[in-house]
């Protein structure tokens, strides 16, 4: 039972940190390279 409580208290923290860092990374990429979705389609 102790392992389950540790798991349930660790996973939300790790997923929050993961999604927070992923959102920050995507925001910084969009800040440095705006409209990056258009680059592969209009590269000619």
From Swiss-Prot:
TM region positions: 7-27
GO BP: photosynthesis
Superkingdom, taxonomy of origin: Eukaryota
Keyword Iron: no
Any Gene Ontology CC annotation: chloroplast thylakoid membrane
Mode of membrane association: Single-pass membrane protein
Matches recorded under InterPro entries: PSI_PsaJ, PSI_PsaJ_sf
Location of the protein in the cell: Plastid, Chloroplast thylakoid membrane
Primary localization class, coarse: plastid
Record's keyword terms, sorted: Chloroplast, Membrane, Photosynthesis, Photosystem I, Plastid, Thylakoid, Transmembrane, Transmembrane helix
Gene3D superfamilies hit by this protein: Single helix bin (1.20.5.510)
Function, in words: May help in the organization of the PsaE and PsaF subunits.
HAMAP family registered for this protein in UniProt: PSI_PsaJ
Family: Belongs to the PsaJ family.
Protein name according to UniProt: Photosystem I reaction center subunit IX
